[in-house]
UniProtKB/Swiss-Prot annotation:
Keywords: Disulfide bond, Glycoprotein, Host cell membrane, Host membrane, Host-virus interaction, Hydrogen ion transport, Inhibition of host autophagy by virus, Ion channel, Ion transport, Lipoprotein, Membrane, Palmitate, Phosphoprotein, Signal-anchor, Transmembrane, Transmembrane helix, Transport, Viral ion channel, Virion. GO terms for biological process: protein complex oligomerization; symbiont genome entry into host cell via pore formation in plasma membrane; symbiont-mediated suppression of host autophagy. The M2 protein from most influenza A strains is inhibited by amantadine and rimantadine, resulting in viral uncoating incapacity. Emergence of amantadine-resistant variants is usually rapid. Glycans are attached at N20. Its main location: virion. Residues 61-84 are annotated as: Disordered. It comes from Influenza A virus (strain A/Swine/29/1937 H1N1). Homotetramer; composed of two disulfide-linked dimers held together by non-covalent interactions. May interact with matrix protein 1. This is Matrix protein 2. The keyword Glycoprotein applies. The modification Phosphoserine is found at S64, S82.
Length: 97
């Protein structure tokens, strides 16, 4: 005897969703939130390179130099460059023959 004959199968009208005719505001809010979440997730997956690249490089620009005299800007650049030059000593140069 087959297992399929032993399993009860639901009748046709039990397959439908029972919450369609419900006017509960909680159900409506959950549906709206679910749809918005799905839309945002799809947009995130489509444009994640643009979004995260902008966030990553947008935060690394450094302080604004607006309104700062050019001499002070140059001094700041030299300090930043000297800090980078000091860090270069920690790396090992490997020369290939």
């Amino acid at each position: 005897m087959s297992l399929l004959t032993e399993v009860e199968t639901p009748i046709r009208n039990e397959w439908g969703c029972r919450c369609n005719d419900s006017s509960d505001p909680l159900v409506a809010a959950a549906s709206i939130i679910g749809i918005l979440h799905l839309i945002l997730w799809i947009l995130d997956r489509l444009f994640f390179k643009c979004i995260y690249r902008r966030l990553e490089y947008g935060l690394k620009r450094g302080p604004s130099t607006e309104g700062v005299p050019e001499s002070m800007r140059e001094e700041y650049r030299q300090k930043q460059q000297s800090a980078v030059d000091v860090d270069d000593g920690h790396f090992v140069n490997i020369e290939l023959e």
